[in-house]
């Protein structure tokens, strides 16, 4: 792994190939050959996504002269990552492929990072921007931790498959993208008040991506392959913005902290992108921005715009708002040192989240 010799230098790692479109999965072998990969590939997938993509990937790789095997994974926990690493070592894998939703791809990221071998990202749903970023989510001691790894060597997004995923997943992905609005506002605030490093280019790419999804919200439809392509491209752009910045700052701010706090207090009440979308409404209000625009876009996209839609009690929302600043205390946001209970309730009620 590369170690930078000077503190002023920065290391930017981006995917070398992105193939997105209907039938893209069939190109996996050609992409691997083009990237000069060779030897054995280990496909990491879930029990449901194995039949959707995992087995087809292994077969396509075999047809192109690669050896390939499949390992089924479940929750992204340290023990599961260790199990996959051991499997990859025993198999003598030369590269990994994460195929499925966020869990399989996160495990592939972490295992590949620790084994110092490349990995490819093959999403089967457009539910979050982790499909392209160097950040991996890991469940540790009942909490979700963001772990820096490396960006995928390539992304193969078959929008024919992705468009057939449950509509809720794509709506959640849109919520994750729209949350870039407040993530950038938080980042700019940290730059002004804390002199935090800030990348104009990464911020511009992230903001443009969020704006594109909001502007195109009326034409993004479930089960529609062109819509899936739009959302996938936006998620990839968001992931690239994080790679350019060298952190998750362009796509993760106070709204993500709220989402993680909510999931800690009441686990499993909503998908990551859904919680981030709701958080974005509140955080945009706190920033003095157009929170109504965020709320309306989420509703048009079929994503929840209130806690009631996810059966989350009002008191849980208020508690999450008062605790959110503790999720990443080193990351300065509009939440500052925390909201009082009264301020949290007022923000949630004003924005009609509760």
Curated annotation (Swiss-Prot):
Kindly state a single biological-process term from the GO annotations of this entry.
glycerophospholipid metabolic process
Give the co-factor note.
Binds 1 zinc ion per subunit.
Q: List ligand-binding residues for substrate.
A: 129, 176, 260
This entry carries the following GO cellular component terms, namely:
cytoplasm
**Catalytic activity annotated for this protein?**
sn-glycerol 1-phosphate + NAD(+) = dihydroxyacetone phosphate + NADH + H(+); sn-glycerol 1-phosphate + NADP(+) = dihydroxyacetone phosphate + NADPH + H(+)
* Annotated signal peptide: none
* The organism's place on the tree of life at top rank: Archaea
Main EC class the enzyme belongs to:
oxidoreductase
This protein's cofactor list reads: Zn(2+)
* Residues given in the record as Zn(2+) binding sites: 176, 256, 272
Task: Please name the GO terms that the record assigns under molecular function.
Answer: glycerol-1-phosphate dehydrogenase (NAD+) activity; glycerol-1-phosphate dehydrogenase (NADP+) activity; metal ion binding
Q: Which pathway does UniProt place it in?
A: Membrane lipid metabolism; glycerophospholipid metabolism
Where is this protein primarily located? cytoplasm
Q: Which UniProt keywords apply?
A: Cytoplasm, Lipid biosynthesis, Lipid metabolism, Metal-binding, NAD, NADP, Oxidoreductase, Phospholipid biosynthesis, Phospholipid metabolism, Zinc
**Pfam families named among the record's database cross-references:** Fe-ADH_2
Q: Which residues bind NAD(+)?
A: 102-106, 124-127, 133
Q: Where in the cell is it found?
A: Cytoplasm
User: In the Enzyme Commission scheme, what number(s) does this protein have?
Assistant: 1.1.1.261
Fetch the InterPro entries from UniProt.
G1P_dehydrogenase_arc, G1PDH, Glycerol_DH
Q: What job does the chain carry out? A: Catalyzes the NAD(P)H-dependent reduction of dihydroxyacetonephosphate (DHAP or glycerone phosphate) to glycerol 1-phosphate (G1P). The G1P thus generated is used as the glycerophosphate backbone of phospholipids in the cellular membranes of Archaea.
Give the family per the record. Answer: Belongs to the glycerol-1-phosphate dehydrogenase family.
Q: Would you tell me the protein name for this molecule?
A: Glycerol-1-phosphate dehydrogenase [NAD(P)+]
Q: Which organism is it from?
A: Methanothrix thermoacetophila (strain DSM 6194 / JCM 14653 / NBRC 101360 / PT)
User: Which gene is annotated as encoding this protein in its UniProt record?
Assistant: egsA
